[in-house]
């Protein structure tokens, strides 16, 4: 195991336009970090640079006490798990898991021992004699993880490993990856576009956008205190409600742009200090914080539709030219055309600068 250091990492393919812009992060020995963001944000490129599959234009990558910029992937002491399982169809599970060690010249007894240990961890022991075509998608992904485990690397790299699995298997494999990390405590970097994977697996999340690390922090901190409009809108399902508008001179109301209502926002932390009154802002509030509750300021939301999700419902409406979503308990399902008293708890309101996109306060 080893710490992983990324200092000033930049990537350009043509020497002019950069696709990664000065990524700086220190990943502790044994830490599980998730790179999350939309397609094209640079997360997979960064992972490939750590692996040695892409060159570093500027900056330094260190694994443990070794700078690895100039090292081949095989010399970096890393193991990768890919979206595609990349199993040899003519080999058994045991042969697939041990093949990487075999071509490195590791003695047979050591290979057998490591394969047996990994198979026990991943509950693959009954499947060792089978070939990939005889396995389910989840079993194949466990074999791919087993192949990485037997290398006993300093760093695990996961490149969207659950993307090919159905929803039920993704939940199962997330739990298995959590248990695996708890048992092995190996430094891990995991790439995904799925925020649920990011929030449930990570000790720290790096939210990527257009080649920048928009925010780095514990999942709960990123969720509860997003630093930019992008993070606020990307993390969370459904996303945070974001509304452009103007804060009144007395800081008591927020007039939603596009003919929306004047929302009661008095008492929100920072108003009058870090949040200047009498100017434009982007107001954010999460759907679950708008659930009607006694003693909390409310605003009327005309309901356009209501989605039944099982344990709860999502009521949809509009304020001005902004779509608004409110999460409701299972028993509350307002009909189309009715008015919902959407809560606006002052301590749950977020304000962002409309020009820079950065959080106020």
From Swiss-Prot:
Residue ranges of domain ABC transporter in the record: 4-235
Main location: membrane
Enzyme Commission identifier(s): 7.6.2.10
Bilayer topology: Peripheral membrane protein
Residue ranges the record marks as coiled coil: none
Disulphide connectivity of cysteines: none
Highest taxon listed in the record's lineage: Bacteria
GO biological process, alphabetically ordered: carbohydrate transport; glycerophosphodiester transmembrane transport
Subcellular location: Cell inner membrane
Keyword annotations: ATP-binding, Cell inner membrane, Cell membrane, Membrane, Nucleotide-binding, Sugar transport, Translocase, Transport
Catalytic activity reported: sn-glycerol 3-phosphate(out) + ATP + H2O = sn-glycerol 3-phosphate(in) + ADP + phosphate + H(+)
Pfam family, one: OB_MalK
One GO molecular-function entry: ABC-type glycerol-3-phosphate transporter activity
InterPro entries from the UniProt entry: AAA+_ATPase (IPR003593), ABC_transporter-like_ATP-bd (IPR003439), ABC_transporter-like_CS (IPR017871), ABC_transpr_MalK-like (IPR015855), ABC_transpr_MalK/UgpC-like (IPR047641), Mo/tungstate-bd_C_term_dom (IPR008995), NA-bd_OB-fold (IPR012340), OB_MalK-like (IPR040582)
Residues annotated as binding ATP: 37-44
GO cellular component, as recorded: ATP-binding cassette (ABC) transporter complex, substrate-binding subunit-containing
Primary role: Part of the ABC transporter complex UgpBAEC involved in sn-glycerol-3-phosphate (G3P) import. Responsible for energy coupling to the transport system.
Family to which this protein belongs: Belongs to the ABC transporter superfamily. sn-glycerol-3-phosphate importer (TC 3.A.1.1.3) family.
Quaternary structure annotation from Swiss-Prot or TrEMBL: The complex is composed of two ATP-binding proteins (UgpC), two transmembrane proteins (UgpA and UgpE) and a solute-binding protein (UgpB).
Designated name of the protein: sn-glycerol-3-phosphate import ATP-binding protein UgpC
The organism of origin for this protein: Burkholderia ambifaria (strain ATCC BAA-244 / DSM 16087 / CCUG 44356 / LMG 19182 / AMMD)
Gene designation: ugpC
